[in-house]
From Swiss-Prot:
Essential cofactor(s): Mg(2+)
UniProt source species: Escherichia coli (strain K12)
The name this protein goes by in its record: Multiphosphoryl transfer protein 1
The HPr domain, residue ranges: 1-90
Functional note: Multifunctional protein that includes general (non sugar-specific) and sugar-specific components of the phosphoenolpyruvate-dependent sugar phosphotransferase system (sugar PTS). This major carbohydrate active transport system catalyzes the phosphorylation of incoming sugar substrates concomitantly with their translocation across the cell membrane. The enzyme II FryABC PTS system is involved in fructose transport.
Catalytic activity: L-histidyl-[protein] + phosphoenolpyruvate = N(pros)-phospho-L-histidyl-[protein] + pyruvate; D-fructose(out) + N(pros)-phospho-L-histidyl-[protein] = D-fructose 1-phosphate(in) + L-histidyl-[protein]
NCBIfam families noted in UniProt: fruA, PTS_I_fam
SUPFAM superfamilies, A to Z: Enzyme I of the PEP:sugar phosphotransferase system HPr-binding (sub)domain, HPr-like, Phoshotransferase/anion transport protein, Phosphoenolpyruvate/pyruvate domain, Phosphohistidine domain
Free-text comment on this protein's domains from its UniProt entry: The PTS EIIA type-2 domain is phosphorylated by phospho-HPr on a histidyl residue. Then, it transfers the phosphoryl group to the PTS EIIB type-2 domain. In contrast to classical PTS systems, the fructose-like PTS has no requirement for HPr and Enzyme I; FryA combines a IIA domain with an Enzyme I and a HPr domains.
Keyword Cell inner membrane in annotation: no
Region annotated PTS EI, chain positions: 119-650
A cellular component term, taken from the record's GO annotations: membrane
Length: 831
């Protein structure tokens, strides 16, 4: 018997997804493999995902795999590599605390005295709809069904039907929905899940319905006893697939509380299973209040992915009496506003207007090409692994795909994908891209990405081993099939080809020969294809850096794989905790290497990108811009922030920063340089058209201040509109800012304003301002920075003096539009 000892690396513990992947890895071997959690003193068959989940394994638990059988030596090598390198990738990422923190109630809402219930924010957003209570269905009718001779047959039929339904949904869904459906499919295909139902029927003589329910209760009891929140929240998944089995087996016993949403609805339930959520008409799902759902439940993950706000912590009995009433679920502030009056509804209408403006502005910004502050162009692209990720990447502002990991098509399957399957996958992403470039990295398999059906022997050091372009000659037919598929797809869009792990010119010359052979074959076969294709290499082996000039004669572009390049340059395994602190690309040697690559390539008219993790690190963006890189490719959620930051950077200043960094003697000196580097920011004018509004239909003072502060947030003049609003209200409490003549001048000197601003709203009708000076038709709000000195007094004084002038006031009230108001104020006032 051989043993692998390790500490569990999974932050969320051994839940469904990693348990399924570990089970799949272990199931490849004939040997018996036992998983042991030493903290729990729990053992499990490693070829059963449910058994693995039942061990209650948490992050950093001491664990081992015991392997015994004819292929134990090979199994140990493969599984040890998997545990050390890829096991952690099977975990899911928990939302950050910042996403889940309720904001204090803004004064513009609290002053309206709304009827509120307070909960915990699980998914942010605001939803308006009718409160609808969903009662849980009783399973007693299924439990009471007597045993039958046909039960075993019915179980097999129901399992097969459910698997077929899940597979059909998998074909129709993408993103988080697909991931969660895959987890459910893995659970029903687990031998222990169905095996325990069979044992309950044969050994305890239970009927099929009772056996399904008993199995559900047993598994849920194990999960509920776990110390891990994440594992406890998998109870909903077990209940979900068990209830689906019951409904398939006895369709005549329809659920009493089937959900049909015919109007905007705030759904209130003890819990909601993922399949129930997926069955809803999301157009009418305004929000959810789930009493028992935790922060990592699959239903909540789906809700976040669908932008559905969710609260918890509100007992059902506290809400039941409000069923059927209108409400607002505010998952920004963590409140439920019951039966809102006109004023409260008005607050949320203003909030929605601001949200719509923000969304429109973000979409417009994401769609813009990436430029530096001084108009230096740089491409911002996305790293993706499947065609399904492409639309989301482009929505985030990706100008192309800098790395399409084609090896994902080859993994987790029993045989390689054929040419047609690959062609369809590549064609799909090209059609989604339009004329945007898609860089297909040819299969980076072997080494640390073992593919069982290739039968490549295991290696002591897979990172330095037989992988990527090094295996292509042995598997020339496999490689040729991929080239044919990419060339066929390339006729439908802007496809480019990138070869990984190249270290010599001979390799790329061989690849070019294979491309020509593939083109000849496609012509012979009469298949539509591209006659030529742009060709590049991944620069991740240091030897390439010294012959970039030679490669420039053979390829069109270079993309630096910073992850592997860092490891190879320093001889550091970043997964080895003893040396991983040495893994740092921001050192003089690494930066000088990048500088050499870029300089040599540019001298010969070739472009250079970077597609490792470094490309999306906002802290190092000034260095990457300064080094002259032409493209940065990153995970798509990072793209909007990187584009926004890039617009604030001056390329000349960044070039000087990069020059100084290359002269540093240590990483610490470079970090100090970065800390001291303060990009010059555009000075935004005090008065601007974006902050002037006419004919605004506000009902009260609260809406006016809410809108003007919120608009400053939309326009990037503050990152903290709620805090800025609070400062305005604190000043308002000292003395009312109504100054007479139908004018109010709310003002504050605040740390929360990034660019001092004057905001103006001329109203469609007068509103009360709680002032002896009467109603207000014109609001002029001053928000000045805390470091403005006495400037706010000067501005306020100028305005006050001008407003005494009847002609000036009449001109303000008579101005036809916002531009006319701006022109008048710029003429009359000096700042």
């Amino acid at each position: 018997m051989l043993t692998i000892q390790f500490l569990c690396p999974l932050p969320n513990g051994l839940h469904a997804r990693p348990a399924w992947e570990l089970k799949e890895q272990c199931s490849q071997w004939q040997s018996e493999i036992t998983f042991i959690n030493h903290r729990q003193n729990a053992k499990a068959d490693a070829k059963s995902s449910l058994a693995l989940i039942g061990t209650g394994t948490l992050f950093n638990d001491s664990c081992s795999l015991n392997i015994s059988g004819s292929d134990e030596e090979q199994a140990r090598r493969v599984l040890e590599e998997y545990i050390q390198v890829r096991f952690i990738d099977s975990d899911s990422v928990q939302p950050t605390q910042a996403e889940l923190t309720a904001h204090p109630l803004p004064r513009s809402l609290s002053r309206l005295n709304p009827d509120l219930l307070y909960g915990n924010v699980l998914a942010s957003g605001v939803g308006v709809g009718t409160l609808t209570l969903l009662q849980s269905d009783s399973l007693d009718s299924y439990r009471a069904i007597p045993a039958s001779a046909q039960d075993s047959t019915r179980l097999e039929h129901s399992l097969a039907t459910l698997a077929e339904q899940l597979n059909q949904q998998l074909r129709e869904r993408d993103g988080e929905s697909k991931t969660i459906l895959s987890a459910h499919l893995s659970l029903i295909q687990d031998d222990e899940f169905a095996g325990n139902i069979r044992r309950l029927m044969t050994e305890q003589h239970q009927g099929l319905g009772a056996a399904i329910i008993s199995n559900m209760e047993q598994v849920c009891a194990k999960l509920s006893a776990s110390a891990s929140d994440y594992l406890r929240e998998r109870v909903s998944d077990i209940r979900d697939i068990s209830e689906q089995l019951l409904h398939i087996t006895w369709p005549e016993l329809k659920p009493r509380n089937k959900l049909v949403l015919e109007k905007p609805t705030i759904l209130v339930a003890e819990d909601l299973t993922p399949s129930q959520f997926l069955s809803l008409d999301l157009k009418n799902l305004a929000g959810m209040i789930l009493e028992k759902t935790g922060r990592t439940s699959h239903t909540l993950i789906l809700a976040r992915a669908s932008a559905i706000p969710v609260l918890s912590g509100l007992p059902l009995d506290a809400i039941a009496r409000y069923a059927g009433q209108p409400a607002v679920l505010d998952a920004q502030c963590g409140v439920l506003a019951i039966n809102p009056n006109d004023a409260v509804s008005g607050y949320y209408q203003v909030a929605q207007t601001l949200a719509d403006k923000r969304q429109k502005q973000q979409a417009q910004a994401a769609a813009q090409l990436a430029y530096s502050r001084d108009n230096k162009r740089i491409d911002i692209a996305a790293n993706i692994g499947t065609a399904l990720e492409a639309p989301g990447a482009f929505a985030n502002g990706a100008e192309g795909v800098g790395l399409f990991r084609t090896e994902m098509l080859y993994m987790d399957r029993d045989s390689a994908p054929d040419e047609q399957e690959q062609f369809e996958a590549y064609q799909q992403v090209l059609l989604a891209a339009g004329d945007k470039p898609i860089i297909f990295r040819t299969m980076d398999i072997g080494g640390d990405k073992s593919i069982p059906y290739l039968n490549i022997p295991q290696e002591e050091n897979p990172f330095l081993g037989y992988r990527a372009v090094r295996i292509y000659p042995e598997f020339a037919g496999l490689f040729r099939t991929q080239l044919r598929a990419i060339l066929r797809a390339a006729s439908f869009g802007n496809a480019q080809l990138m070869i990984p792990m190249v270290h010599s010119l001979d390799q790329i010359l061989w690849v070019k020969g294979e491309i020509q052979k593939a083109i000849v074959e496609l012509k012979r076969d009469g298949l539509r294809h591209a006659e030529t294709i742009t060709l590049g290499i991944m620069v991740e082996v240091p030897s390439v850096c010294y012959i970039i000039d030679h490669f420039c004669d053979e390829v069109d572009f270079f993309s630096i794989g910073s992850n592997d390049m860092t490891q190879y340059l320093y001889a550091v395994d970043r997964n080895n905790p003893r040396v991983s602190p040495l893994y740092n690309p921001i050192t003089p040697s690494f930066l000088r290497m990048l500088q050499q690559i870029v300089t040599t390539a540019h001298q010969r008219g070739k472009w250079v990108g970077i597609c490792g993790e470094l490309g999306g690190e906002s802290r190092y963006l000034p260095l990457l811009l300064g080094l002259g890189l032409d493209e940065l490719s990153m995970s798509s959620p990072r793209i909007p922030a990187v584009k926004s930051q890039l617009r604030q950077l001056d390329s000349e200043a960044c070039r000087e920063l990069a020059r100084q960094a290359c002269e540093c003697r240590s990483a610490q000196e470079i970090e100090a340089l970065l800390t001291a580097f303060t990009p010059e920011e555009d000075v935004r004018p005090l008065l601007a058209l974006e902050n002037i509004f006419v004919d605004q239909d506000f009902s009260n003072k609260e809406q006016a201040i809410q809108f003007l502060c919120g608009n400053l947030g939309v326009n990037g003049r503050t990152e903290h509109p709620f805090e800025l609003e609070e400062d305005v209200w604190q000043r308002e409490e000292i003395v009312t800012t109504g100054v007479g003549f139908g004018v109010a001048i709310p003002h504050t000197k605040s740390q929360w304003i990034r660019h001092s601003s004057i905001s103006i709203a001329r109203l469609a009708k007068p509103i009360g301002w709680q002032s002896e000076m009467g109603e207000v038709e014109l609001v002029i709000m001053l928000t000045l920075g805390a470091n403005e000195g006495m400037n706010h007094v000067k501005v306020f004084s100028q305005l006050a003096r001008k407003l005494v002038n009847k002609n000036f006031r009449q001109s303000l009230f008579a101005a036809q539009d916002a531009q006319s108001i701006l022109t008048l104020l710029e003429t009359e006032l000096t700042f």
